[in-house]
């Protein structure tokens, strides 16, 4: 779009900050919502995208006053919206583990979409799930949720992660140091992951 020095109320804009608390859309997980507030105006952020060179593009509409280049601003993430996304993302980890337990270790994640109010999880399998298999998967996920299992994140070498049995996304390229997410005291679920998650398995009350 067109580069502008200032934007007034009602204008849709994209803002780049020198640093940000916002999570950008990546890995199938949607970006944060929130507010960016300056001395002379504010904007509602409804999408965040990350460019190839690592810049975070905060997309939204000016809701009051005017925002200008070089303004000093405060960036505030919508905490409830972020919590809902984290809950959904954590649930995908539980779902993948349950699917592999019920159907077999051949099951691999083929894609996903994680939003604040729903998830889509694509996986490899040679047949549609039976009603019995579906019920087993559902029960296993619900049991993990009700257990309130701890969610533990660790950074380690890719070799150490593989030794611990961490699941990796097929076709994904990883660096020498990776983030490993384990759910449960005994690492019942263990995956490489860069998304935002809860500190315990998702509660129906979250």
Report the location of each language-model feature.
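A glycine- and charged-residue-rich anion-binding loop/surface
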Residues: 1-201, 205
């Amino acid at each position: 779009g067109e580069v502008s020095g200032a934007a007034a109320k009602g204008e849709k804009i994209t803002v780049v900050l020198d640093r940000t608390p916002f999570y950008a859309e990546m890995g199938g997980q949607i970006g944060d919502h929130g507010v960016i507030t300056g001395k002379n105006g504010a904007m509602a952020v409804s999408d965040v995208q990350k460019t190839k060179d690592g810049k975070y593009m905060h997309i939204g509409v000016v809701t009051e006053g005017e925002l200008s280049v070089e303004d000093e601003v405060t960036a505030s993430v919508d905490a409830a919206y972020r919590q809902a996304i984290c809950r959904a993302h954590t649930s995908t980890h539980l779902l993948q583990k349950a699917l592999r337990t019920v159907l077999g270790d051949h099951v691999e994640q083929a894609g996903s979409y994680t939003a604040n109010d729903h998830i889509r999880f694509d996986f490899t399998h040679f047949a549609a799930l039976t009603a019995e298999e579906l019920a087993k998967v559902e029960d296993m996920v619900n049991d993990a949720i009700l257990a309130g299992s701890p969610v533990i994140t660790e950074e380690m070498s890719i070799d150490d992660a593989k030794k611990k049995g961490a699941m990796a996304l097929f076709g994904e390229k990883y660096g020498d140091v990776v983030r490993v997410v384990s759910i449960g005291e005994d690492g019942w679920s263990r995956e490489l992951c860069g998304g935002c998650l809860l500190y315990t398995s998702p509660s129906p009350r979250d």
